[in-house]
Amino acid sequence: MLRRFMTKVLVSDPIDQAGIEILNQVAQVDQRTGLSEDELIGIIGDYDALMIRSGTQVTAAVIAAATKLKIIGRAGVGVDNVDVPVATQRGVLVVNSPEGNTIAAAEHALAMMLSLSRHVPQAHAGMRDGRWDRKKYVGNELYKKTLGVVGLGKIGSHVARVAQSMGMEVIAYDPFIAADRAQQMQVQLTELDALFRTADYVTLHIPRTKDTENLVDADLLRTMKPTARIVNCARGGVVDESAIAEAIREGVIAGAGLDVYASEPLAEDSPLRAVERGLVLTPHLGASTEEAQENVAIDVAEQIRDVLLGLPARSAVNIPGLSAEIMERLKPNLQLAETLGLLVSQLAGGHVKEMELRFQGEFASHPSQPHVIASLKGLLSAALGDSINYVNASLEAKARGIQVLEVKDESSRDFAGGSLQITTRGDQGNRSVTGAVFAGGELRITSIDAYPVNVTPSSHMLFTRHRDMPGIIGQLGSLLGEHNVNIASMQVGRKIVRGDAVMVLGIDDPIPASLLQAVIAIEGIQEAHPVAL
């Protein structure tokens, strides 16, 4: 008997049939692939859910036309093709499958290591050309070699476990992993430069952020052993591709395996294509296994089914588990919590062991858990980028050994709408920031390390701690002016005259590393931190 559903789901990219069968349990499923934006806008208003892969662009215009839409499901990890902020504003849940391709991506990195070590692609090409080059392609064993893992998340951890089972010694760089967690994995934590100097193989498992873009450049490559090899199956843009090509040609390193690129597809004139030996290239195949495609389809289809049945989603990219009314009411507070978390992480540096949230005044009357999640998302996203969302932030914090404490003080009346204070404790000391939401939803930073300030957050900021003495503000302003850095705003907070003070500058452009060193060199300045919000 044909079942009729009031609920409709649009599948606009090719999805594994296992996912379609799950959706068929609760909705009418229409599969229409290859739609243009205008075509999608023309039909999306009829649908309660949309399931996509990377092909469909879910723009603000598409979301505006989706008057019935409750959920967008991305069968995969990345959601760059979805306007998540607009979806959040419209109360549309966005979900993905952050773990569905973990094994596939990890195994591809390992396959790259083995292919590089035994020259598999080049030997195969020689056989196809009629050659028998046994001497030319003498390789190396992985056994008893040192593997350096940059990023000990789910994928990096799986690579580490398999590598250990093959007899490799594993070292890792991940400032957000607790030492005891690494010890449980029998992985030695080290600094990034030490890892590159020591490792025979380096595998990258980090997101692309402002801090990781071109992280692996010519200078870092020159610190590696000439016999070392590097693999990137994480995100394009974290390695300088021209520098990689040159390093292999000049014998600075023995080889590289790349699956992802700064711009995809890889340009025909890319210098990587001209490297004849020691380089293995694949066209972004990390998640391209039958099992991974089935896993992500099932995972996301189950989440869409659950949401349509009124149940929570397990991998929401935007705020989960809140009604549209509560979400709208708390939106400025959650934005403040995320901003403070992002700010304090950049001030703290190093590994944060504990984060304490102090809810004061009216803030104490609101549900605390959404604020905790938002704060953790901010705290971790400075290093982990878009891989952190409102669902996995708590899990990622727990995996990194970060303890969360909550304190509520409804009696506090420092601001009409209350305030939120976040304190971190870690291997580089304690840091504290406080903020409030003013009239009209305006966010304000009201104290830093107990120094009172009144600062509106901006995209680029510079924080300093200095001695309160004549001339420092003028020297800093002159230095920034000499380097063509425009100051948009400035606040100074102090407790006593001519004691210690903090200075907060809103600036129009990021501070380059060389300029930051010059700032720190000013007499009386004790520390300086550039912050991106």
Please give the residue ranges for each predicted region.
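An N-terminal-biased, well-structured beta-alpha scaffold segment characteristic
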Residues: L2-V95, D217
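Short beta->alpha connector loops at strand-helix junctions that form conserved
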Residues: R32-T33, R53, A75-G76, G91-I103, ...
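Rossmann-like adenosine-cofactor binding region
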Residues: T56-I63, P175-P271
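Phosphate-binding beta-alpha-beta segment of Rossmann-like dinucleotide-binding domains, i.e.
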Residues: R90, P98-T146, V150, H158-S165, ...
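Rossmann-like dinucleotide-binding domain for NAD(H)/NADP(H)
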Residues: R90, V94-V95, A218, T227-L347, ...
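Oxidoreductase and adenylate-handling cofactor-binding alpha/beta cores
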Residues: A106-A125, K145, Q164-M168, I298-L311, ...
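Hydrophobic/small residue at the entry helix of a nucleotide-binding pocket
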Residues: I155
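A conserved regulatory-domain signal marking ACT and ACT-like small-molecule sensing domains
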Residues: G321-L533
